[in-house]
């Protein structure tokens, strides 16, 4: 059976390609598929301990059996945060500049009395090293779905929320540019808009497949998170 494998960020660079189509026997598991890939692309083994797996755009266990036409993605822990095709108005991955005012306007409704907005901005230093610019990469189809999941989780925790919008910018971003914006509205400031906004950006950094590469005078480096999602983070 034919399986499509997509690779992102450091794993894409280690393999030297972003997509691999591979023929495997029936009932092959994800773990067995990865073993085959590491044989054909030995450099991938160096990142095995920090590799996250998704199956058909959601998190999956290594012992899951694959089927004809499945899409497996391999990527490192996400580092997103600080409309393209497939994005909708309130949950978007985009190459275009993003605005705090525009995002706030998306969540203002007649019963809105409070809006909390978080903006992640590209800074010129990270970990004590100078930074010239950042490059963001995303597994776009899965990322939009996970942005919606983050919003749904926030609504469940703070049911008085009126609306929520999240947009992540990808591509090359210069110092001072907005990388990610979260906007949350509620009837009153005490109805959860602050808490939901903070929850959303923190959760984005855990489960939304977005990565960043920092470039400065000392060269370029992929920045990886430390949260390892599991099937409990699946929708």
In which residue ranges do the predicted regions lie?
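N-terminal, polar/charged subdomain of small-to-medium soluble alpha/beta proteins
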Residues: 4, 8, 71-77, 83-180, ...
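Ubiquitin-like/PB1-type beta-grasp interaction modules and other compact soluble beta-rich domains
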Residues: 1-86
């Amino acid at each position: 059976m034919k399986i499509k494998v997509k690779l992102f960020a450091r794993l894409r660079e280690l393999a030297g390609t972003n997509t691999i189509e591979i023929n495997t026997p029936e009932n092959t598991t994800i773990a067995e598929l990865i073993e085959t890939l590491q044989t054909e692309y030995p450099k991938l083994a160096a990142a095995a301990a920090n590799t996250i797996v998704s199956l058909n755009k959601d998190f999956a266990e290594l012992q899951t059996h694959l089927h004809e036409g499945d899409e497996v993605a391999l990527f490192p822990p996400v580092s997103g945060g600080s409309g393209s095709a497939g994005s909708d108005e309130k949950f978007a991955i985009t190459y275009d500049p993003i605005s705090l005012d525009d995002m706030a306007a998306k969540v203002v409704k007649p019963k809105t009395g409070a809006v909390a907005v978080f903006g992640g901005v590209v800074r010129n230093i990270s970990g004590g090293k100078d930074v010239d610019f950042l490059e963001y990469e995303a597994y776009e189809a899965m990322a939009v779905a996970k942005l919606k999941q983050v919003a749904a989780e926030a609504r469940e925790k703070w049911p008085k929320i009126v609306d929520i919008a999240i947009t992540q910018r990808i591509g090359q971003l210069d110092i001072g540019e907005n990388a990610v914006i979260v906007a949350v509205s509620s009837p009153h400031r005490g109805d959860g808009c602050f808490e939901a906004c903070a929850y959303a950006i923190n959760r984005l950094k855990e489960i939304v497949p977005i990565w960043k590469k920092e470039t400065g005078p000392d060269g370029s480096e992929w920045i990886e998170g430390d949260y390892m999602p599991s099937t409990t983070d699946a929708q």
